[in-house]
Amino acid sequence: MESDNMKKALIAMSGGVDSSVAAYLMKEHGYDCIGVTMKLFQNEDAGVSRKKSCCSLDDVEDARNVCYRMGIRYYVFNFSERFKEDVMDRFVDAYEHGATPNPCIDCNRYLKFDKMFQRMRELEYDYIVTGHYARVEYDEEKNRYLLKKAVDDTKDQSYVLYMLTQEQLAHISPVSYTH
């Protein structure tokens, strides 16, 4: 039974080991967890055939299975229209103008963090937990949250989270912060 003061964590599930471990750790620490994955493509076959794809149907199924085994509710957020507008259209435009675009950075900025945080607030959850290796600490002297490298330098992914606002940093828990 969930208590009214139980902290709630929305787990950004990629279907991989790191986000699965993050979900497990948060559940073990007594959080009310839900797992979520972003649907990014209108075409159901898009991204499925590649071994290292992002948010493919295989990834969704893997994340769903992990959540089922842990007894965590699971949802897929359909961000396919936003993905086309905020990531793919920007990618094509930049490429046509001779730039070297990075669609993963735009996806992180506009979808994974912006839209996911919006959903977190709508669902009245306290944190977004990711499988990224980084740390977030509050510095009382500076009166702000600091994004720091992971404890293990070889796995550091703090660069992925560089664009987070102070409000977002206050509500994110990367995997290396969950231990």
Q: What label would you give each PLM region?
A:
Residues 1-163, 173:
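ATP-dependent adenylation/nucleotidyltransferase module used to activate substrates
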Residues 170:
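Active-site oxyanion-binding pockets that recognize sulfate/phosphate
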